[in-house]
């Protein structure tokens, strides 16, 4: 049984919304956080990677779709299914990539730090991380090199060699960061990060003990490098018109659109994103069986999520009973203590007795209501109607008080 719960996945990604993704990808976290606040979203987690920008939202308010132009919006249960697939590496450009697990975890941890996620999204993200781990444990979907930078460097090392080579990384974003990290295992010579922002280039270079420079000095940097890696979000050729300067060098361009003019392949080896894409497609075909096993795991876990969310929704409604009863108790006791004189010990005993009385009176009733709603095939409709009825009842009582 599918239940309706206001959990959404708002996504711009390389596969489903490529044009929208290209428009939105250069915005930072604060930009997307401001969109969520403008739309009055109750809980949200923002995931930003090289190939996707996604907002997972739980809200009782209607989402302002005009704020999230060119995106694809999933409703529940497709929203949580999408997150499970993302965490498992099934939605990655390179099927089974491991980096996405770290990125999902970091996105969730940042939401906790910024206090934008609550009970609902915390449960779902913890579940997604567990599912991602289980998929990788129960299948071979993440075997071998799985990320685009890792695959690119592996090809480069086999064809050209990386050890002791002088390397230039053009860009300082997420993909450039991944290249910087993976390069360490190949023991390169000098590595230089070149970016439009010298401050951003410096920040990345310092993390790994590399050099940094401005992209304004590009031709000179290329002249002094053996391997040139382009990993930016620029929509044009950054590396072009090199002529003989390109000879005996190795170029890697994982940017889309391309950052390196294909004409360079006349003078040097150019490993392009299109060539890497063919390798990724071959890997995807080889992993079809593992994907099917992963989908079985995901579908089973989605059923568990359905049941748990039903429990959480029911608990919220039942909590309304007790909150209302305790508010009435508080008002009545305050009035009682004003007209009669009780010492502190007596007040404490009366408060405990009335709390116990509330629990004993409400428990059988609320438990039977909870069981009735849970077992009814029209769970969602009955729960919502019951909640509206309860809210109206409380509102009327408060007016009388």
From Swiss-Prot:
Q: What's an example of a GO molecular-function annotation for this chain?
A: NADP binding
- Biological processes per GO annotation: protoporphyrinogen IX biosynthetic process from glutamate
Binding sites annotated in the UniProt record for substrate: 49-52, 92, 97-99, 103
Identification of the protein by name: Glutamyl-tRNA reductase
What is written about domains in the entry's comments?
A: Possesses an unusual extended V-shaped dimeric structure with each monomer consisting of three distinct domains arranged along a curved 'spinal' alpha-helix. The N-terminal catalytic domain specifically recognizes the glutamate moiety of the substrate. The second domain is the NADPH-binding domain, and the third C-terminal domain is responsible for dimerization.
Note from the entry: During catalysis, the active site Cys acts as a nucleophile attacking the alpha-carbonyl group of tRNA-bound glutamate with the formation of a thioester intermediate between enzyme and glutamate, and the concomitant release of tRNA(Glu). The thioester intermediate is finally reduced by direct hydride transfer from NADPH, to form the product GSA.
What is the species listed in this Swiss-Prot or TrEMBL entry?
A: Picrophilus torridus (strain ATCC 700027 / DSM 9790 / JCM 10055 / NBRC 100828 / KAW 2/3)
InterPro entries assigned to the protein according to its UniProt record, in alphabetical order:
4pyrrol_synth_GluRdtase (IPR000343), 4pyrrol_synth_GluRdtase_dimer (IPR015896), 4pyrrol_synth_GluRdtase_N (IPR015895), GluRdtase_CS (IPR018214), GluRdtase_dimer_dom_sf (IPR036453), GluRdtase_N_sf (IPR036343), NAD(P)-bd_dom_sf (IPR036291), Shikm_DH/Glu-tRNA_Rdtase (IPR006151)
Recite the UniProt keywords alphabetically: NADP, Oxidoreductase, Porphyrin biosynthesis
Please give the Pfam families that the UniProt record associates with this protein: GlutR_dimer, GlutR_N, Shikimate_DH
Keyword Manganese carried by entry = no
| Subunit composition and interactions | Homodimer.
* Catalytic reaction equation(s): (S)-4-amino-5-oxopentanoate + tRNA(Glu) + NADP(+) = L-glutamyl-tRNA(Glu) + NADPH + H(+)
Give the enzyme's EC designation: 1.2.1.70
Membrane-traversing stretches: none
Residues annotated to bind NADP(+): 171-176
Q: What does this protein do?
A: Catalyzes the NADPH-dependent reduction of glutamyl-tRNA(Glu) to glutamate 1-semialdehyde (GSA).
What Gene3D superfamilies does the database record attribute to this sequence?
Glutamyl-tRNA reductase, N-terminal domain (3.30.460.30), NAD(P)-binding Rossmann-like Domain (3.40.50.720)
Which pathway does it take part in? Porphyrin-containing compound metabolism; protoporphyrin-IX biosynthesis; 5-aminolevulinate from L-glutamyl-tRNA(Glu): step 1/2
- What does UniProt list as catalytic? 50 (nucleophile)
Family of this protein: Belongs to the glutamyl-tRNA reductase family.
Site-annotated residues for Important for activity: 82
Q: Which PROSITE patterns match?
A: GLUTR
Spell out the SUPFAM superfamilies in the cross-references: Glutamyl tRNA-reductase catalytic, N-terminal domain, Glutamyl tRNA-reductase dimerization domain, NAD(P)-binding Rossmann-fold domains
Return the NCBIfam families for the record. hemA (TIGR01035)
């Amino acid at each position: 049984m599918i239940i309706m719960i206001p959990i959404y996945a708002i996504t711009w990604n390389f596969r489903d919304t490529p044009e929208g993704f290209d428009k939105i990808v250069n915005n930072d976290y604060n930009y997307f956080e401001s969109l969520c606040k403008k739309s009055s979203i109750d809980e949200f987690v923002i995931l930003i990677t090289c190939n996707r920008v996604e907002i997972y939202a739980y809200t009782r308010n209607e989402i302002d779709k005009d704020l999230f132009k060119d995106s694809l919006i999933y409703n529940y249960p497709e929203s949580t299914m999408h997150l499970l697939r993302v965490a498992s590496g099934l939605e990655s450009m390179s099927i089974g990539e491991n980096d996405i697990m770290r990125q999902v975890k970091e996105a969730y941890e940042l939401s906790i730090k910024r206090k934008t996620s609550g009970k609902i999204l915390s449960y779902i993200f913890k579940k997604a991380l567990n599912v991602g781990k289980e998929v990788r444990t129960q299948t071979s979907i993440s075997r071998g090199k799985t990320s685009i930078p890792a695959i690119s460097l592996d090809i480069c090392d086999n064809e050209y060699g990386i050890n002791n080579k002088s390397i230039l990384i053009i860009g300082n974003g997420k993909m450039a960061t991944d290249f910087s990290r993976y390069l360490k295992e190949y023991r390169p010579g000098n590595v230089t990060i070149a970016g439009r922002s010298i401050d951003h280039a410096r920040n990345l270079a310092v993390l790994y003990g590399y050099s940094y420079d401005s992209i304004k000095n590009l031709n000179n940097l290329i002249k002094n490098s053996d391997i040139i890696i382009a990993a930016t979000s620029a929509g044009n050729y950054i590396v072009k018109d090199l002529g003989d300067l390109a000879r005996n060098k190795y170029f890697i361009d994982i940017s889309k659109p391309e950052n390196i003019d294909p004409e360079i392949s006349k003078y040097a080896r150019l490993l392009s994103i299109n060539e890497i894409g063919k390798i990724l497609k071959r890997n995807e075909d080889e992993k079809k069986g593992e994907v099917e096993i992963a989908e079985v795991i995901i579908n089973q876990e989605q059923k568990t999520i359905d049941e748990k969310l039903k429990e959480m929704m029911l608990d919220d409604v039942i909590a309304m009973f007790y909150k209302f009863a305790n508010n009435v108790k508080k008002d009545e006791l305050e009035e009682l203590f004003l007209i009669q004189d009780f010492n502190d010990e007596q007040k404490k005993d009366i408060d405990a007795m009335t709390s116990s009385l509330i629990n004993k009176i409400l428990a059988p009733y609320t438990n039977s209501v909870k069981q009735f709603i849970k077992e009814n095939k029209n769970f969602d409709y009955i729960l919502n109607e019951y909640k509206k009825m309860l809210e109206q009842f409380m509102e009327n009582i408060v007016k009388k008080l």
